[in-house]
Regions:
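Low-complexity, intrinsically disordered short peptide segments enriched in small/polar/basic residues
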Residues: 4, 53, 101-102
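Short, solvent-exposed secondary-structure capping/transition elements
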Residues: 22, 43, 47-54
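Amphipathic, non-membrane alpha-helical rod segments
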Residues: 26-45
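Amphipathic alpha-helical binding modules
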Residues: 57-113
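Short terminal alpha-helical segments
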Residues: 1-26
């Protein structure tokens, strides 16, 4: 997948995140994985071109606006705190995601949502 495609997919995901956006834990985690790959590119020796960095920043702002912070990573996945996107969940969840998350309990034993 090219850098442009990776960023476009993250951008598309954050644009579609409307209240009640239908997604499953698996689909949501897959999208968060896109952001992780972008972060790996951002940490590389060659910075992202300015126009791509702006798209990522705009997408990140949309994602933050449509989500709420968690004290543990989304759905019990393992992630470093620097991967802030893993520590957020949609503010308004569709029924499939809500049901999926109700079944997931993080290692600390407290429900995520």
């Amino acid at each position: 997948m090219t850098v442009d495609e990776l960023i476009r997919r993250w951008d598309d995901f954050t644009t579609r995140m409307a209240p009640g956006f239908p997604t499953s834990v698996h689909d949501h985690a897959k999208a968060l994985g896109l952001r992780t790959r972008i972060a790996e590119l951002e940490a590389g020796a060659v910075p992202l071109p300015a126009h791509l960095a702006r798209r990522v920043a705009d997408s990140d702002a949309r994602f933050r606006h449509a989500t709420v912070e968690l004290s543990v990573p989304f759905a019990g996945y393992q992630a470093p705190r620097s991967a802030w996107w893993w520590f957020r969940r949609p503010a308004a969840m569709g029924p499939e995601l809500e049901a999926d998350l109700a079944r997931v309990v993080p290692r600390e034993g407290t429900p995520i949502a």
